[in-house]
Amino acid sequence: MGKRYYCDYCDRSFQDNLHNRKKHLNGVQHHRAKKAWFDNFRDAATLLNDERSKEVCRKFVQTGQCVFGTSCRFSHMSEKQMKMLEQKIDDEKRQKEDPDQDGSSERSVDEWLSRREKKLAALTSGRVLRMEEEECTENIEIPPYLLSIPDLPPSLHPPPAGGWRVTVHNEWG
């Protein structure tokens, strides 16, 4: 049995030789799967421009489905969906123009440096526990979309209300 070629776009494998690979890469199924893959990464502005340039799909409007699916040359987006997409684009533009406008939870470098200096000073003077208590009481903002993910790994769960218990192990083994 020879080597096998696996196509990530189509999720299938076949014997790897020049004829089979060329036949697959030029096939309609591969082109559709590849287009669908790259369409997942298109930004909202290009998606909106493409949908606006298309006419509305009458079959989709009448029945709620279209036999051509994503390869249909007509638009399947409603006016409401287009408005939501426009709003998303406007929000992204505002975010790029002024990222500090909405009071993002990201800290500046100066804040980080001042906190680092406080920690180092606390370590030298022995006030480590008090500093950790102050950090736990800070207001931690968790993005709402993060909590909506069903199987979130434990490392991404928000910290408990009282903070984690700190245990100091002086001995190894």
UniProtKB/Swiss-Prot annotation:
One of its GO terms (molecular function) is zinc ion binding. Keywords: Metal-binding, mRNA processing, mRNA splicing, Nucleus, Spliceosome, Zinc, Zinc-finger. InterPro entries: U1-CZ_Znf_C2H2, Znf-CCCH_4, Znf_C2H2_sf, Znf_CCCH, Znf_CCCH_sf. A zinc finger (C3H1-type) spans 51-79. Gene3D superfamilies: 3.30.1370.210, Classic Zinc Finger. Pfam families: zf-CCCH_4, zf-U1. One of its GO terms (cellular component) is U12-type spliceosomal complex. Its main location: nucleus. SUPFAM superfamilies: beta-beta-alpha zinc fingers, CCCH zinc finger. It is found in: Nucleus. It comes from the Eukaryota. One of its GO terms (biological process) is mRNA processing. The keyword Ubl conjugation does not apply. Residues 83-111 are annotated as: Disordered. Disulfide bonds: none annotated. Component of the U11/U12 snRNPs that are part of the U12-type spliceosome. PANTHER family: NUCLEASE-RELATED, ZINC FINGER MATRIN-TYPE PROTEIN 5. This is Zinc finger matrin-type protein 5. It comes from Danio rerio.
